[in-house]
Amino acid sequence: MSEIQSLTAQALADVAAAHTPDQLETLRVALLGKNGSITAQLKQLGTLPADQRKAAGEAINLARDALTTALSERKQVLETAALDARLEGERIDVTLPGRRGERGGLHPVTRTLERIVEIFARLGYELSDGPEIEDDWHNFEALNFPPHHPARAMHDTFYFGDGRLLRTHTSGVQVRYMDTAVATKSGPPLRMIAAGKVYRSDSDQTHSPMFHQVEGLLVDEHSNFADLKGTLSEFVRAFFERDFEMRFRPSYFPFVEPGAEVDIAWQQPDGSTRWLEVLGCGMVHPNVLRSVGIDPERYTGFAFGLGVERFAMLRYGVNDLRAFFENDVRFLRQFA
């Protein structure tokens, strides 16, 4: 009996002194395993006198239960300590300065395009879209371009082998818009703008083979040139957020009659003022209205077009159009 008590006391001390789960498992096997010391005591019960077996068995069972409980409790203590140590090692110091994310920004051409569209939306114009690969009818014929017009020449237009082309202006969207309005009997009256990429075989400091254009169209029973002037004057004032002296110069565009180019009195860095062309416009040619099934005797309309990059250059003081397409981060970061 004293032997089991001594063995139990020593075993409990060893369990309490274990510092790792591996040490604890080694003790468990040595004490309670198949060949463990407590197990050996149970096997020796049969060799004891009959009057001692009951008391010895009770003592061994009590020792086994005490050791099992001690092993379980010590295991829990070691696991908790290990978890605390891991949490401490992985703790995030919230007082450290964070990593700042780089703030992006819209491209200046995109900013300008969205600004133009938003202004015309306030004036009641609906944004419409169309294909960049266009057919001859929508890009030229329906817009009153005679077959001999210079804009049809190969040096102005990018053609595909099947006769299709990269649109040279967004006016083709106006034709599609009017076609749909007539077919669905949703207009006229109608007003819309088309915005997107256009393509022309031209490249220098102020021209790019690909650029962005916004064109607008209004068709109604009583629209006139005064309405056109008022619309464009309001747009220019809203875009630049200041008033400009404007002039409308007679000009020729096949799809309008009369046609005009719009100049604004632009102040130079040296304080002088010069006229700067910013828009083309005019009253929709009757042939264009007829091509989409609108009666020009009843309806009139006006149209206008502008280059987005041109307005971006003026708004941001950029002198070279090509800077918008070179993807120089040093340049683009100024607009972020």
Curated annotation (Swiss-Prot):
Reactions accelerated catalytically: tRNA(Phe) + L-phenylalanine + ATP = L-phenylalanyl-tRNA(Phe) + AMP + diphosphate + H(+)
Alphabetical UniProt keywords: Aminoacyl-tRNA synthetase, ATP-binding, Cytoplasm, Ligase, Magnesium, Metal-binding, Nucleotide-binding, Protein biosynthesis
Cofactor field: Mg(2+)
Chief subcellular location: cytoplasm
One GO cellular component, as annotated: cytoplasm
Binding residue positions for Mg(2+): E257
EC number: 6.1.1.20
Alphabetized GO MF terms: ATP binding; magnesium ion binding; phenylalanine-tRNA ligase activity; tRNA binding
Cofactor-binding details, from the entry: Binds 2 magnesium ions per tetramer.
Keyword NAD listed: no
Compartments where located: Cytoplasm
NCBIfam families (UniProt xref): pheS
Family classification: Belongs to the class-II aminoacyl-tRNA synthetase family. Phe-tRNA synthetase alpha subunit type 1 subfamily.
Assembly, per entry: Tetramer of two alpha and two beta subunits.
Protein name: Phenylalanine--tRNA ligase alpha subunit
Gene this protein is translated from: pheS
